[in-house]
């Protein structure tokens, strides 16, 4: 009975971010759809507490005999430490440097930011990710990417023999289910949020473009609404309070929440007048999909992956253009008929993105490449 081992190290990261969310959601769906002849287990590096990496109905996590830094260095140097299992899935580029005979390896590459926008990462982070992605396309059986945009960029910046498969993300059930408006209001009230606001969701770091959004919200033609920012602090000196003061956005119009759970995020999204996604670079943009699923209008930049995911259901603005972003947000908030049409289209489009579909596609790939590895 073959075993699929999934590396869940990202769940133990100080800031799991979107890749951590992807790991947990995908694993949960894969556990529910495991082929009868397969089993699934998880593996991490050594940590004091492995509890954050526990996924219901999946064995593990089993800790490899190295801390994260040691495991990363070992694989970076090309040492062939196989994490166990007959097939391995790496939900991030942290992956074994080569495939054992009779085994198979699939790696998810979420974006090409290290190649296209290295300045938005630390120097070491950009270099490590570039090398890890190049290893994956050279040595893994397949590389999974979330959008056609990333597939095209990957081919341009890191071509290799690995099969590149596009498998989109999904929308969690908490964003699909109906939530009583009174309950949503109660939840946002407990968080001391205003009744109406423009929302941004994501890790607070340079590539998210929050500096442009703060500047846009301070423009005289922007909607006269508060700005709510949800998400953990990442790397980089992105101080939202200082940015607000610099651009003339009154302190009372900025609300920074930090990380929230999915139940509260669902309520926050539902109560928002608009979701603003001012990113400089993205591989998918899960908040866009989640906003579409709850019926909240979206304004996003012209990053190819965001344009692809939104599919014409959001308003698109040029990256880095605060004036255009302010105007688009005003249009979404003020133009009820056009906004209602975009929201209706967004609801239909979001329904096509499910974690069950993503899990089915991943299982198809794993079974295919494991069978190929054992047919030689």
Where are these regions (language model features)?
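Carbohydrate transferase catalytic cores enriched for Leloir-type hexosyltransferases
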Residues: 1-376
